[in-house]
């Protein structure tokens, strides 16, 4: 059965009408006086930095706000006020009238369920048969651009790439053919090529199903090609609202002008220093296992014949699309995965070190992972997380406390943050905690895997300024993995471009960007 929708929609009918929506905690406003309306075919972009009220406004539209929050105003969908109806009616409206693609598919997709159940679950809950559900899921997977959907049906989320996970999320949201689709940061951690593919896909699906589309983003320049209406939020207040092209031509607020200014400049020049890392003929291969006994049938190359050098205080940017080998290279450098070739760090070949010597050298070589929410233990306070690396050393508790405080100060977090848990922090604050955890052991080289991908432009600028300052004061070297060329240009002295596991470009940053 092919999913279609009649195109004889009444263009004057409002699918969504929000009147003076305000949301607050007991003592703090989160959103103040939001007004908007949407018709079929409209694309609205809601843009702002972390904590501006973007996501919470859309959770309100979905009827998913925590009960402890105070709300006022009206959200009218299908002639009903979402803020006043009972849970049963809300459940019916969710999926049938309005659906949402959440920001991080890795956490939003149930790791214990196969794709077939994830996508088809709502269809079955609405009374559909399993046979029809499977047909619909296969068609939806085709519609969202997944090749070989019959094979993907049986896969678990961890077996999918980032782009595939995002497409599965979109399919799950579309299964009941909603009239309004909300996409919360749908391209945050994706490379530039995948970003374009996902946004083009959303627009084509909008046209096919006659939906209204709400794009939530921290990147004003990213949504320019895809939205016709724009709301800019700052600290819970609407600072700009209207037709997108008009706002781009003549932004009224200073805040919007700052968001539009996306050139972060070039990396600061450094004095020539001694070499601390030399990589020669580095290769990473993953086994391909098939058959009943899961035997190795061959190997796929993740990193192929990579060579480069890094000096003290120098920053190397590694860029490439998803699957190009960036993260595999980073994991190989700290020997978290097996590799072949020579990794000469501070005069020692990491691939030849015994475990005891490897543990010792890891204090000088630290990695900050892409998703701080996933890499920070939710049961530990910030102080405990940062102190973890010091526990293996013979250091007194008093000195550990002092070093933790010093590390937090370096990343511009106040002492009071020690007692908070990861879920109590913003995205930028969590990234600073992950950075402090690496800095507390006083490394000479930091490997940063997409550290700014989930951050808004303002927080990105602050993070880049912080990394620049740390590079000067701590004499750090960086290997900076990213898909954002503006960020790489701002921080790195050299750039390496990977494609299909191979180096296709390796030269000084200014030379590459001025070519």
What are these regions (language model features)?
Residues 175-179, 440-444:
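A short, proline-enriched helix->beta-strand linker immediately N-terminal to the Walker B motif
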Residues 238-242, 250, 506-507:
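ABC ATPase "signature
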